[in-house]
Amino acid sequence: MKEKELVVNTKTNGSKSEDVIISISLVKKLRDATGAAMTSCKQALQEAKGDIEEAIKVLRKTNLAQMSSKLQRKADEGIVALAVDNNKGAIIEIKFETDFVARNERLQKLAMEAAQLALVHDNLTDLKNAKLSSGETLESQISQDIAVIGENIQVSRIRQVKLVDNGIIASYIHNSVAPNLGQIAVLVALEGNVESDKLTKLGKNIAMHIAATNPRFLSSNEVPESVIMQEKEIFTAQARTTGKPEKVIEKMIEGRVSKFLEETVLLEQAFVIDGKTKISEVLSNAAKELGSEIKITGFSCLKAGEVVE
């Protein structure tokens, strides 16, 4: 079957014009190389008379002129990437406007290199100013990619998890599109005087649990009093609509606060693997089996594109 072709009229001499044939495969090739929209690729190839390299320059020139407006557009899609190096792990989120860009191989490589840089730079300002292997800063490279792709791209969040004593940094990627790259990224610092390979399976399972339950806090002690008070106010307002006696309402509020902690505190959550054993008990059972105290000292979970309050 003959490939479809686009016939483009391009002025060459005065009012004369000649037809430049641009194949669909050429448009797709430019799209794969840049991540730009099909329409933009077609227009760029039209202006460049079918020359791929010139078309990339056209895309950059056109999109640079529109850069200010692009940076104001919402970027709701994204990917998260993680990196682990001995006693430290890092996660970064890069947001785009469409999920197509998230599948762009060049942007995926950029995200993975940015995650490696995040092992050293623990805040967005330093990370954006850090230099990539190309010699460009991360911020500069992203500006260039915006110019080519034509979408707003943002490095939006960064997280680090560190070990203090012996242990491992366990990791998990959900909906992976490439190694250490996907839609949900989790890091867990698991400490104990145990051979690292014996902690690996436990750490992986806990990381998967975190991806499924997205806890907000590690322990009940870490929940701010302001959060508890806010939840109590909500529960109190709900309970009073029942018209029940004050003592009954107090018991209802206590029960709802306990349930809130069970849902949001990692150590209080029921392990997703069996649905009943608390994570704190999972650690205790593992400690008995391995002959050493095992504790979670930190964790982080980022979901690509989530709305952060």
Curated annotation (Swiss-Prot):
Residues annotated as signal peptide: none
GO molecular function: translation elongation factor activity
Location in or out of the cell: Cytoplasm
Region (Involved in Mg(2+) ion dislocation from EF-Tu): 98-101
Annotated Gene Ontology cellular component terms: cytoplasm
Cross-referenced InterPro entries: EF-Ts_dimer_sf, Transl_elong_EFTs/EF1B, Transl_elong_EFTs/EF1B_dimer, UBA-like_sf
Gene3D superfamilies cross-referenced by the UniProt entry: 1.10.286.20, DNA helicase RuvA subunit, C-terminal domain, Elongation factor Ts, dimerisation domain
A Pfam family matched in the record: EF_TS
SUPFAM superfamilies: Elongation factor Ts (EF-Ts), dimerisation domain (SSF54713), UBA-like (SSF46934)
Domain of life, source organism: Bacteria
Cited function: Associates with the EF-Tu.GDP complex and induces the exchange of GDP to GTP. It remains bound to the aminoacyl-tRNA.EF-Tu.GTP complex up to the GTP hydrolysis stage on the ribosome.
Family matches, as HAMAP family: EF_Ts
Listed name of the protein: Elongation factor Ts
